[in-house]
Structure formats: C-alpha cells, structure tokens
Swiss-Prot record:
<dbReference type="InterPro" id="IPR007644">
    <property type="entry name" value="RNA_pol_bsu_protrusion"/>
</dbReference>
<dbReference type="Pfam" id="PF04565">
    <property type="entry name" value="RNA_pol_Rpb2_3"/>
</dbReference>
<comment type="function">
    <text>DNA-dependent RNA polymerase catalyzes the transcription of DNA into RNA using the four ribonucleoside triphosphates as substrates.</text>
</comment>
<keyword id="KW-0804">Transcription</keyword>
<dbReference type="Pfam" id="PF04561">
    <property type="entry name" value="RNA_pol_Rpb2_2"/>
</dbReference>
<comment type="subunit">
    <text>The RNAP catalytic core consists of 2 alpha, 1 beta, 1 beta' and 1 omega subunit. When a sigma factor is associated with the core the holoenzyme is formed, which can initiate transcription.</text>
</comment>
<dbReference type="GO" id="GO:0000428">
    <property type="term" value="C:DNA-directed RNA polymerase complex"/>
</dbReference>
<dbReference type="Pfam" id="PF04560">
    <property type="entry name" value="RNA_pol_Rpb2_7"/>
</dbReference>
<dbReference type="Pfam" id="PF00562">
    <property type="entry name" value="RNA_pol_Rpb2_6"/>
</dbReference>
<dbReference type="InterPro" id="IPR007645">
    <property type="entry name" value="RNA_pol_Rpb2_3"/>
</dbReference>
<dbReference type="InterPro" id="IPR019462">
    <property type="entry name" value="DNA-dir_RNA_pol_bsu_external_1"/>
</dbReference>
<keyword id="KW-0240">DNA-directed RNA polymerase</keyword>
<dbReference type="Pfam" id="PF10385">
    <property type="entry name" value="RNA_pol_Rpb2_45"/>
</dbReference>
<dbReference type="InterPro" id="IPR010243">
    <property type="entry name" value="RNA_pol_bsu_bac"/>
</dbReference>
<dbReference type="InterPro" id="IPR014724">
    <property type="entry name" value="RNA_pol_RPB2_OB-fold"/>
</dbReference>
<dbReference type="InterPro" id="IPR042107">
    <property type="entry name" value="DNA-dir_RNA_pol_bsu_ext_1_sf"/>
</dbReference>
<dbReference type="InterPro" id="IPR007121">
    <property type="entry name" value="RNA_pol_bsu_CS"/>
</dbReference>
C-alpha cells in the first residue's frame, strides 16, 4: 500500500480483512456536482440556468407584434472573496448578465416579417456562489442547502388499505404527479364507481374526463370492455363461447353442444370442463332467452324504419327490448362481458351516474368544479381544460416523470413529451381497473425508486424560474404598450423579482440552514443530510410511521442509524458512505460485479429499481484466492429479502462493509457490537463534540478519520506535489515539482492559513502547520491541521484512561467522575469566540454616536476603552463591562425654570443623551481578540477605524510583498538555470544584480527565447502584483455598504476559555453519555500496580441494559494500543538500535489476519524515527465497522504489549491504598466533550422583567427569566401543608405587583415582613369571566 507523506508519519494498524475495492468517494460531491450543473452553461438546455431561460423565453406580446428572445448568459466575477464576505456580512455571489434580443414584427407586412432587431446585455441580479466546501455565504454567515427527498413525478397506484370505509373494503386509487402542474387522481368509491379529482378538489365521475376528450359512450365501452356476441336463430338464442370466460361460474342451464352435455345445470365450471371445451373447439352454445336479460348493450340499436333507439349503449336488455330488436331485424347482438371475479362492470356503472352527455357539457362540469361561481362559456371551458394537462407552459412531467410514467404503464413512445395525452389517461384508468380486478400490484410509496433527491442546483433553478415567470408577466404587458421603437431590452426587464426569488430561497427557505460548524464531522454530515421536510415535501405532523421507517431499499443509500431523535426521526436522513445521485435524482449504491461465480473488481452503481432484479451477496461473504465464493450457500439479498442462495445465482456483491451506514456511523469502532438505538446517539453526539485545545487522534479508530478531515475542507491540502519551502503560523509555501508545472508560471504555491476565527457555533477555527521546511509532499497531502484534526485525521476528543467501577455514588445514573489531572493538563479545555455587535443608527432625534464620553459613568468603567470609545485588543473583560461606548439622543423634556438657569450657566451636558453602550453579557468573561469597525460611505472615520485600516493595509502589503518575493525568487532561480546552461559562470551571476539578469543576452537562440519568455512573465508578475495591491487597497479604504439608516457598526470578538467542570456533558462514541459529577484530586483516584491513576471512572451498570458492548471492546483495544506505545517508550529509554525497532514494528503491523501490508524495511531511517516518535503515545488502530478486530486479535495485541489478556487490572483505592476486591476493566476510551456546557445553561434570577398581561416573571435564560413554579409543585407544597410558603410563591414572588414592590423596600430596610395582596393573574381571570357576560365581584370577609 502506498502511504502519502503525512500518513507515513503515523501509520494506523488496520484490522480490516476485506480488500478495499473502491475508495470512499468525495464526501461533498452531492452538493458541488449539483450546483456546478446549475451554474455551468449547458448547450443542450437540459439543466440549470440555461433550462430556466429556455423554458420562459421567447416572451411574445399579447398582440403578437413583438417578442423578446434569449440569446445567452454569462456570470461576472465576484466583488469580494469568501473571507471578505464573511467579515463584511455580505453575500458571496456573481452578477448574472443575460444577452436578450428584442424582435419587432411589421404589422402591415405578411406575418413573420421582421421590422427591427435590438440586442443588448441585461443585468438580472446576483446568483449566490457555492464555496469550495459546498456552503453558501449569505449575509456573511455560512449556510448549507440540504437536499430534499420528495415523491418522484410519475404515476402511482395505491390503496387506502381498507381504512376509509367502515366495511373495510379496499379502495384503490391512482395519482398522476407532475413536476409542476395540476395533480390528477382517479379513485374508486365503496360502490365501485370510478371518480376523478383534479388538484384534490371535489370528485367527478371519471368518464367526464373521457367525454371532455371527445369520447362517446360507445367508444368508452369499447375501450374498457370485452364483448359477448349473441345471435338470434329461429326462436333460439346462440351465444359465442370463449371457454376461459366461464371460469368460476355456476351453470344456470345445461351447457351442451353437438348433443354432448359438458356441464350440468347448477354445477360449478372447473378448469377440467374448460380444457374439455377448448379441446373439442366448441365456439357456440345455445342459451335460454332469459340468459340475455339484464346484460348490458355495448352500442346503440336503432329501428331503421322509424329512427327510434330501441336499446341505447350501456342500457340493460329486457324481454320487450329483445322482441323489438328481432322485429326490427337485428339478428346479431353485442353485449358487455362482465363478471364478479375479474371483469367488474365499473366503467359501465360510472357512465350511469355521469350527468354529462357530450364534450361541451363535460367541459362545463369540469370548469364549474375548478372555478366555482364563475359563469362558464364554451371558450373558457375549453381553454381551462386544455391548459390543465395539455399545455407545456402549465404542465410538465419532466424527464424523470415521463420515464417513471412510461415504465409504469408500459409505454415506449412519447419519451420527450412533458404533457399528458389521451393514451396516458386511458392507460392509467385501464391499469387502475386491472388492479381493482385483481391483476397487478399497488406501488410502494416508500420505495426509493419512487422517491428522488432534489439537490441545491435543482431547487435554485426552480426558484430562478419562479422569478423569471414573474418577470414574464410584466414584460408581456410592456411589449403590448404601443410604441416599441425607442425601447431597449433593458427597459423591459426588471431584475428585482428575480433577485428577490433567489434571495428568498437562499436566505429563508426551510432547506437553507445555518451550517452546523461545531467540528469537521458536523459540517460534512450537514452537507450530506437528506430531508423529507420542506416545500413540496412532508410536514412533521402528517408524516406517519411508514415514511419514517427504514425501508429495504435504504440499503447502501440512506443510513439506517443516523437520524435525529424526536419529532423528526426518520424524516431527516443521512447519505450512506458510498451512495450517489444518478442523472434522474435517484440514489445509487455501488456493487462488485460477479461474472460466472467469480467476484471481479468491476463496480456498477445500481439504483433501487435496478437492484430488485439481482441477487446480491454481502461484503463479508468468504472468498477463495481466485475470487470465487468459498461456501455453497451464501447469505444474499433479493428484492429486499435476505436469504440463502446457491453461489451460482449471485450477480453482485457489496463493495465494503460500511456501505450501509453513513460517515458518522462508520466512525464508531465496533459498531457491530452496539445496539442500534445507542449507535444512533453515538453518531449524533459526535457531531456535537467541541474541538479541544490540543487535538488528539483516537487510538481506536475505523480508518475513515482521514477521509472526513480532508474532505471537510478544514485542513489545508496540497493542490500539487513539491518541496516545502517555508512555513510559519500563517502561511505555507510549496515549491512545485517540475512535472506538475503549468508552462510559464513561477512554480510556487502559497497556502494562507485561517487563524482564530469564529465558527457558526462560536467554536474556534484555527489552522496549524504540520509540515517542516524541506519536506517533500504529494498532491492531496495535509499541510496544516484545522480544528479537531491531528496529522490529517479527524480528532474530536481525547483518549482517556478509564476504569469501569462504581466510586462512592459519584457515578450513579450515568454520572462521570473525572480526575483533576485532566483539568490541569487542559485535556478538555476549549476556546469559544463570541461576536458582539454595536450598531450606531440615524434616529429621528439625531444620530447615535460612538464615543468614550458617556454620561454618568465612572472613570474605572472606561478604563478599557480607547479615545474613540472602543475597547482595545487584549483587554480582559467580564460581565457588565463596556465594550463600545455609545450615546443616543433622547427627546427634549420640558425643563423647569431652575433647570434652565443651571443649563444656561453650566452649558449643555448629558441631559439630552442616554447611554446605550455595548456591554459584555452577564455570564460571560474573556479576552478581546479582534475589533472591526465598518463606516458608512460618506461618514467620517474615527481614529480607531483609521488605525485598523492602516494596520490592514500594512498586513496586505506585507503579505503581497512576501508573496511577490517568493514568486520572484522562484522565477529568478529558473532564469539563473537558463543563464548557467547558456554559458554564464556562477561567480559572474552572483556579482550581477539579480534584476539585471533578465537583460543579459545569450548566444543560443532557443535559450534566448526562453529568457525572453521569463522576462515577459516577470513583467506580468509585477503588473499583477500592482493590480492585486490596488484592488486590496481599494477594498480596505472604501466605505462599507451598510443597511439603510446605519452609520457605523463595531464588531468585537471575545475569546472565552472553558475548562471542563462539573455539569458539563461528555460522551463516548457508543451513545454512552453522562454529566460530570465531580472533579476528584489525582491522589484519590484508583491506581494500578505501577502507580498509574485512572483519568475517568465510569459506571459499569451503564453497559448491560443499553447493550452497547462496543465500548468495552474499544477500551480493551485502547489498552493494548497504549501497551504497545509503552513498550516502544521502554525501548527508547533502553536506547536499543533501530533494527530492533524495525523488527518490533513489523511484528506489530503483521499481527492478526489483515489486508494491510506495511513494509517497515521500505521506510528510511528518518521516517522510522518519526514513526517511532508518533507511536510513543500509543499505536493508532483502525477497526472498520462490521469488519473489526476479533477477540483473538485483541488478546494477541494485549499479550504483545505485556498486558493481561483479560483486559482487567487490580486497582487500589487512592484514599486508603487498599486493593479493590476484584480486578477492574481498565483501558483507553475516546471521550468527547459535547457542546452542552454548564456555563451556557446555569442561570439565576433575583428580580427582572415581567410579562405584560399576567405580570409574572418571564421564562428562560435569554429573557433573564425565573423558574416556573407549576401545578405539580403547588400540589407538593399543599401535600406538606406548607401554607405560608405557598402563599409567598403565588403572590409576592410571582405576580402580586404591590406586594413585591413593598417586599423589596422592606428587605432594603432590613424588615423581613411580607404583605401578600391580589395576584395580577387572578384579575386577568376575573376580566376573562366578565368578558363572557358573567358578573363576578369579590366580597371582603366580614
């Protein structure tokens, strides 16, 4: 296996046994690919902006004299880059410019003669851009657009499962769902009539739709029924016999032909009878005349002589009618064939309840239902019906919809057609009737072949189209308004509706969410989330159990584990590790192809629909060397059912064991030993882990950690290979390898690192270089670690030495006992950065001012502010301190003469402004790390703003100059190489000024051209540098575009250091969560025979009932890993030679049956030394999910580390020194600190604000509210008979306004008496009763 440069520094021992056929695909591709499709120009016009434009344009005027045509579009360059957008609070977007052509036709000339053509580029608003990490920056905050799982367009056949009608009869229905347009439903009622609904409105008999399509009764009957022919032959009645139709009937007369009686009267017709009739070729039998009575005629029978209708189509035949028919000479009669078994008379019955007689009456009926109250006209009715399903503007099935529709009704023409036609409607009705007759199956709505993914690109395109349609109406009107000679396309288009639609979608759609940025994993999982909620999706209340449940087709597509607990369970899912979307938006998952019983490395992606046809083996099926299956019978899946299949029948095999689960779930080692409910909590809690101060890789991982860290985009990854030229805290410079150069560039890559910035969740984002100058790197290598990454691996928590034992009740009910050492070593210390904003506005009474001159504030409170009234960087502040001084003018009050006199003498001061400074919130204390001042264009900048500006300019200049010098150096080195090969000596060049090298001449023409090219590049580089600096300077110095009425914004960034403390929530990766109950001194913690104390004590009772045994295995394996580290440390202490180390390491990496081949011999001495250095803390281990380390391997590793194979040690009590009576499981578990910190939750109130109506204290920390003393608490005091306490609770402590004011005064005076009065809420109750017209008065006790 080839290890990349960073991987060699610390090789994970892999316990996986299955070979890796397929690497995990790029994790964010679902977002990036979808958006690229939307943005990039598609010549076919199938997707994205192009499709939206083509669907709306050309726009014709109402009178047809002119039209506006679409030519092409282009996207400009963004004004600010991503970081600048975040700082300034603006949207990262590109301007959209569209080339339009206005064509004016000549009214007087024949149609289509062009009078004038004008072309122009029109600005059509801004299109937000996706960053490289799959997010959008909207108004300065990073947001994610979650993909939506919605019902695919097409036709669905379903039943109510007998729930609608009391009889329990199953009613079938069919629904045609377009991508946009009206829904068309067909449904049976309990009487077996077939009805139709349009857009879920009132139902009409379904034959109305057929009549509206111009069908007569005869044609309708002809389409839906088989016929039976009767012939009248001299007083007898002969019936045409199709033997198959007799199945299951009881003969009402002797069935005989040619003198043979086949079935006697009253006998049931069996299959044997039918075979006999078929064999003898009986095609006509004589029937009694009564047999035809009650049968339904299939067409009109007319008396030729009089012209009267004897029997109409769909009318029952009676004896009189029969007599009339034979009189009129109708010898051949055609009736409908129906029976109760599989040819129901549904359409015939429906025709009887249908009141319409012809096309017009049917159209009018439909019009009345769609537009009740409007008088129908023939034209309006026709136009409405036409536009409902047959017009491309109003109705579109989309490619997906048409594909699903055709496959459902078995049509193979009309592949491109987006609208419905007559055939479609009739075929759907036929299929529905067939299902009612017992042929065919209803669809499963939760099957992933019937639900598709709508990603960012598609949703943005839909919103964009909505905006365009709004514009279209306005354009049509303007085109019809007379004189077009002076009009240009720009005058017709108003970009506001378009940008409003797009802005609304990105800013406030239910699926545009504030990115979860706790740690790299939470970012990745948020972008891979699939939601069934949102516009056009389900709602929480309506979603039943079936939709939320795991479906067999989720296998390898959606994760069965990772979903939120609570009301959204099952509605919000996560993409499985290898899943991807196909062109139609259906989820696919990869499988290895099996050819003639041999498993190949060829991989096919199958969607849920395709998968149903194959037999698929599991990833852990045993294989022989040659790729054939080892066992005769193999566990495999077919149509979602798991079972044993002979190996010859297998078509495919899973690619990997973690194919089923999502990324978060595949980060849980030994997932296979955990109960699913706990695994769900484990997967969800990893996303809440706060990045610790020092990231530490997990000793026991699953091998996916590197993928997450690299794909999440928090690390800095080499774009091209090369040698590290220089490294400092803020930038890394790489000299690119010769073979990866683009001709004519300097060959230097510069990576600027992010330092101490705030994430959406107020955690700290900081990148630290993990390479040294002179090191070689390859493309894709990690150069710098971000938050929660360690040497390019995801590191959400810390490896803690834990013991499973009770300890004095401090770990009762999932509490956690932590050693003081953990706090001292800052293992779980986290940094949180808060942004506090102060806005100075223009008010009616004058503008607010940011100043250090604040009325009635002492000197001490201003000590941390500079002269501009803004706090300086580095100040340590606590709750209540002023950060930005601000005063607001307040309204003139009427002054008394005395005050006027005083003001006249002492001048105006303080009376006309009030203090509205920005203060530190109460429970917060920390250090100021950054201040930013934004000033409106045209407002004078204060001193602090100018200082910041100067500093930024200096930084920008320094950065760009360094960058230029690096690039210049690279270029001049190449010049030097050319000159040296052209005959100049090293000494000569060293004495010449480097800039002059470019002016030297060479004999060799080829070299001279090369030199000239380099000189040209040098000039370009310089010009580029000047241009870059000018742009930077302009951006820094120009005024900011602030919201209307805002003059200045000051943003202050406050860093808070949070150590771990009792009340903080911690968790392992197996759903084992708990709250810290006590921080115990190290000397009191249990310790082992070597005197090493444990860090954390967990309760063993938390394991058996929760069935997450994975944590025990993790602890054992962690202990073994640490044992190997200790062994290496011992060898280092003994200063053994390198060969011994190589031998030991080889032994460790070869242990157990594993797919991993590590050849220590191929590493250089330096590399081995680095590896040893990184393994001293313990051997990192990968145990992939469902393919993890076996019990035997763990024991072997424990043995190699010199530890007991049971994984249990004798521990001694730290307080007494006595040994505990039985060995205790001790080991290393990876623990996370979750973002539920006690500091953010702890809250107490003395007095504060009250609710307006009830006058009771508000609730919640944000409102500085009180604790609710509810109904049950009142019962408790009543039960104790604590009458006075209860009275106090319900009056002065709550809503007795006078009482509480008095009480406050009394306490101030040192008198602790209380006088309870009438609670305000009681008055509210009285008012409410009076509002009902009941007079209620309070009487004093006499």
């Amino acid at each position: 296996m080839v290890y990349s440069y960073t991987e060699k520094k610390r090789i994970r021992k892999d316990f996986g046994t299955r070979p890796q056929v397929l690497d995990i695909p790029y994790l964010l591709s679902i977002q990036l690919d979808s958006f690229d499709k939307f943005i990039e120009q598609d010549p076919e016009g199938q997707y994205g902006l192009e499709a939206a434009f083509r669907s709306v344009f050309p726009i014709q005027s109402y009178n047809g004299n002119s039209e506006l045509q679409y030519v092409s579009y282009r996207l400009g360059e963004p004004v600010f880059d991503v970081k600048e957008c975040q700082i300034r609070g603006v949207t990262y977007s590109k301007p959209l410019r569209v080339k339009l052509r206005l064509v004016i036709f000549d009214k007087d000339a024949p149609a289509g003669t062009v009078k004038d053509i004008k072309e122009q580029e029109v600005y059509m608003g801004e299109i937000p851009l996706m960053t490289d990490n799959g997010t959008f920056v909207i108004n300065g905050t990073e947001r994610v657009i979650v993909s939506q799982l919605h019902r695919s367009p097409g036709v669905f056949f379903d039943s109510d499962k007998g729930k609608t009608h009391s009889s329990g009869k199953v009613l079938y229905n069919a629904r045609i769902i377009p991508y946009r347009g009206s829904w068309l439903d067909f449904e049976f009622d309990p009487k077996d009539n077939l009805y139709v609904r349009i857009d879920r409105r009132r139902k009409l008999p379904s034959t109305i739709i057929l009549r509206a399509l111009g069908k007569s009764t005869e044609e309708i009957l002809d389409t839906f029924f088989e016929k039976v022919n009767f012939e009248v032959k001299d007083q007898t009645l002969m019936m045409e016999l199709v033997p198959d139709r007799l199945r299951g009937e009881t003969a009402t007369f002797d069935i005989e032909a040619n003198g043979t009686v086949y079935v006697e009267k009253g006998r049931r017709v069996t299959a044997r009878h039918i075979r006999q009739l078929e064999k003898e070729g009986v095609d006509q039998i004589e029937v009694p005349v009564e047999y035809i009575v009650g049968k339904v005629s299939s067409k009109d029978y007319i008396n030729e002589a009089t012209g009267e209708i004897i029997v109409a189509a769909n009318q029952e035949i009676s004896l009189e009618a029969l007599a009339k028919l034979s009189q009129a000479g109708h010898k051949q009669l055609e009736v409908l064939f129906t029976n109760d078994l599989d040819h129901g008379p549904f359409m015939s019955e429906t025709l009887r309840i249908d009141s319409s007689v012809d096309r017009i009456s049917a159209l009018v009926e439909i019009y009345r239902m769609m537009r009740p109250g409007e008088p129908p006209t023939k034209e309006a009715a026709e136009a409405l019906f036409e536009s409902l399903f047959f017009s491309e503007e109003r109705y579109d099935l989309s490619t997906v919809g048409r594909m699903k529709f055709n496959s459902s009704i078995g049509r193979d023409d009309a592949e491109e057609q987006g609208t419905l036609d007559e055939t479609d409607i009739i075929e759907v009705m036929k299929k529905l009737i067939a299902i009612r007759n017992g042929k065919g199956e209803v669809d499963d709505i939760d099957h992933l072949g019937n639900r598709r993914i709508r990603s960012v690109g598609e949703m943005a395109e839909n919103q964009f189209r909505v905006g365009l349609v709004r514009v279209e109406r306005a354009v049509k009107e303007r085109l019809s308004l007379g004189d077009l000679d002076a009009v240009m396309p720009q005058d017709l288009i108003n970009a506001k509706p378009i940008s409003a639609a797009v802005k609304e979608f990105f800013g406030s759609s239910q699926l545009s969410q504030f990115m979860d940025q706790n740690n790299p994993l939470s970012e990745v999982t948020h972008k891979r989330r699939i939601s069934a909620l949102g516009p056009g999706g389900l709602t929480r209340e309506r979603a039943g159990f079936e939709v939320r449940d795991v479906h067999v087709t989720h296998y390898g597509r959606l994760c069965p584990i990772e979903t939120p607990e609570g009301p959204n369970i099952g509605l919000i899912n996560s993409l499985s590790a290898f899943a991807r979307c196909n062109e139609y938006g259906f989820l696919e998952t990869p499988y290895r192809r099996v050819v003639d019983g041999v498993v190949t490395d060829e991989v096919d992606y199958l969607s849920a629909i395709e998968e149903g046809q194959f037999v698929i083996a599991q990833a852990n099926a045993k294989l022989n060397e040659d790729g054939t299956f080892a066992d005769e019978l193999i566990t495999a899946r077919q149509k979602g059912e798991s079972g044993l299949h002979p190996r010859e029948h297998v078509d495919y095999m899973d690619v990997a064991t973690n194919q089923v689960v999502s990324i978060a779930a595949s980060l849980i080692p030994f997932l296979e030993h955990d109960d699913a409910n706990r695994a769900l909590m484990g997967a969800n809690m990893q996303r809440q882990a706060v990045p610790t101060l020092k990231a530490e890789k997990p000793l026991v991982g699953t091998g996916i950690e590197r993928n997450v860290a690299v794909d999440s985009g928090v690390t800095s990854v080499a774009k091209r290979g090369g040698i590290i030229q220089s490294v400092d805290a803020s930038r890394i410079v790489v000299k690119v390898n010769e073979e990866e150069l683009i001709p004519g560039e300097a060959g230097i890559d510069i990576y600027n690192l992010t330092k101490y910035t705030r994430s959406n969740q107020n955690t700290c984002i900081n990148q630290r270089p993990c390479v040294m100058p002179g090191e070689p790197v390859l493309r894709g290598d990690v150069l710098a670690d971000g938050p929660s990454t360690d040497l390019g691996e995801l590191a959400l928590g810390q490896n803690m030495r834990i013991a499973f034992m009770p300890w004095n009740g401090y770990n009762f009910e999932d509490s956690i006992l932590v050693s003081e050492r953990v706090v001292q070593e800052d293992r779980f210390t986290t940094i949180h950065i808060q942004e506090l904003t102060c806005v100075a506005r223009d008010t009616k009474l004058g503008s607010e001012e940011i100043t250090a001159d604040i009325p009635n504030v002492g000197e001490s409170a201003l000590s941390k502010l500079d002269e501009s009234g803004i706090v300086y960087i580095g100040a340590e502040v606590k709750g209540g301190d002023i950060l930005v001084g601000k005063v607001t003018p307040k309204g003139e009050t009427q002054l008394t003469p005395e005050e006027k006199l005083l003001r006249a003498i002492f001048g105006e001061k303080a009376s006309d402004v009030k203090d509205t400074s920005l203060r530190v919130p109460n429970s917060v204390s920390g250090t100021i790390i950054d201040v930013q001042v934004f000033t409106r264009d045209g407002v004078e900048k204060d001193k602090r703003a100018l200082e910041i500006e100067q500093m930024q300019l200096k930084e920008a200049k320094k950065d760009l100059t360094e960058e230029f010098q690096i690039l210049e150096g690279g270029l001049l080195n190449r010049v030097k190489a050319v000159l040296l090969s052209g005959g100049y000596s090293e000494a000569k060049l060293d004495t010449t000024d480097r800039k002059k090298w470019l002016e030297l001449t060479l004999e060799d023409d080829a070299l001279q051209t090369q030199l000239e090219q380099l000189a040209e590049q040098y000039d370009e580089l310089k010009a580029d540098f000047d241009k870059k600096f000018e742009t930077k300077r302009r951006k820094i110095t120009q005024g900011d575009d602030l919201a209307p009425g805002v003059l200045k914004i000051v943003k202050v960034y406050l860093a808070v250091k949070r150590r771990i403390q009792p009340g903080d929530k911690m968790a392992g990766r197996h759903g084992n969560k708990g709250v810290i109950s006590k921080i115990n001194p190290v000397e009191d913690m249990p310790y082992d025979e070597k005197g090493q104390p444990v860090d954390i004590v967990l309760n063993p009772l938390g394991v058996p009932s929760r069935m997450n045994i994975g944590q025990i295995l993790e602890v054992h394996l962690g202990l073994a890993a640490k044992g190997i580290g200790d062994k290496i440390n011992q060898m280092v202490k003994e200063q053994q030679e390198l060969a011994k180390f190589r031998e030991f390491l080889q032994k460790v990496y070869d242990l157990g049956e594993t797919r991993q081949k590590v050849d220590i011999a191929s590493l250089s001495d330096e590399e081995v030394r680095t590896l040893i250095g990184n393994l001293r803390g313990g051997l990192p281990i990968a145990t992939p999910v469902f393919d993890g380390a076996s019990e035997a391997s763990i024991k072997e590793l424990l043995k190699l580390g010199g530890l007991p194979e049971s994984g249990q040690l004798t521990l001694f009590d730290g307080r007494t020194g006595d040994a505990f009576e039985r060995p205790v499981t001790v080991g290393y578990m990876y623990m996370l600190k979750l973002n539920h910190l006690v500091d953010d939750k702890m809250h107490a109130r003395s007095t504060g604000s009250y609710s307006l109506v009830t006058q009771q204290p508000l609730g919640g920390k944000a409102q500085f509210g009180g604790q609710r003393f509810g109904e049950m608490e009142v019962w408790a005091l009543e039960a104790y008979g604590a009458a006075y306490t209860l009275q106090e609770m319900l009056t002065v402590k709550s809503d007795d306004v006078n009482g509480r004011t008095k009480m406050y005064k009394n306490i101030v005076d040192g008198n602790h008496a209380m006088e309870p009065g009438m609670p305000e809420s009681f008055n509210v109750l009285l008012k409410e009763i009076r509002s009902l017209g009941i007079n209620i008065e309070l009487e004093d006790e006499q």
